[in-house]
């Protein structure tokens, strides 16, 4: 199960991919 787009975007920003 993938996290919501809103949260996923923030996580990607923090992780930096």
UniProtKB/Swiss-Prot annotation:
Lipoprotein as UniProt keyword: no
Protein role: Hydrolysis of carbamoyl and sulfocarbamoyl esters of paralytic shellfish toxins.
Post-translational modification: Glycosylated.
Tissue: Ubiquitous (at protein level). Highest levels of expression in digestive gland and crystalline style.
A GO MF label: hydrolase activity, acting on ester bonds
Enzyme class (EC, first level): hydrolase
GO terms of biological process kind: toxin biosynthetic process
Enzyme Commission (EC) number: 3.-.-.-
Superkingdom: Eukaryota
Organism expressing this protein natively: Mactra chinensis (Chinese surf clam)
Keywords: Glycoprotein, Hydrolase
Subunit structure: Homodimer.
Name of the protein this chain belongs to: Carbamoylase-1
Description of pH dependence: Optimum pH is 7.0. Activity decreases sharply with increasing acidity or alkalinity.
UniProt activity-regulation remark: Strongly inhibited by the serine proteinase inhibitors BSF and AEBSF. Not inhibited by EDTA or by the proteinase inhibitor aprotinin.
Influence of temperature on activity: Optimum temperature is 20 degrees Celsius and activity decreases sharply above 40 degrees Celsius.
């Amino acid at each position: 199960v993938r996290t919501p787009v809103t949260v996923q975007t923030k996580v990607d920003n923090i992780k930096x991919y």
